[in-house]
Amino acid sequence: MASGLTADIARQQDTPARDRLWARYRDEEFANRLSSVPWNDALDTIMSHRSVRTYRDEPLPPGTLELLIAAAQSAATTSNLQAWSVIAVEDPARKARLAAFAANQQHILDAPLLLIFVADLARLRSISDERGHPGIALNYIEAFIFAIADASFAAQNTIVAAESLGLGGCYIGAMRNNPAGVADELALPDEALVIFGMTIGIPDPGIGTDVKPRLPQNVILHRERYAPPDPALLAA
């Protein structure tokens, strides 16, 4: 009887939620405790995220770019100002030049699509100028912060949408290594700054990538007020 009960409990705990949570935290107790939470495809996609840097030598299906950008534009945006832009790069020669600015990362060359996310105050400045407004608010650091936030929200929607379609991707922070060079290559105006790039493609099934574990929630999650983390948790 006891062994049967143990088996039943084990089967109950062997759920998609439990598997995804264990992969993300490597914490059996935590994963088992949340094994019966409500689950859906959206959560499964989000919690399965991993960076993909190796792709099949295949183009993306027609309409994929536009669908990804529709997902990106569905993200939250500060006061609906939409202070971001994205540049889709598919030309191999341009990708090679951009890769040279970003530590020559091979996946920039290999991916069929490279997206460059831009914190874009230039468009708002242009609108202000056309309407004869001074656009004073654009001179404050707050404007740059919300432009970065808008670009980041859009990018995260993009990668989640891509993964939901069976695609893979990888953020490229090294696109900030040479801001002037990247801006010149992409013909960026003043007040438009690259925040990061993102490669998108069909993952190479022969080269797997693992889900990387994250810090324990007790380090990241603060309830009511900020509290310094337990040093033992940081050491782990």
Predicted feature descriptions by range:
Residues 1-236:
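Acidic, surface-exposed loops and disordered segments
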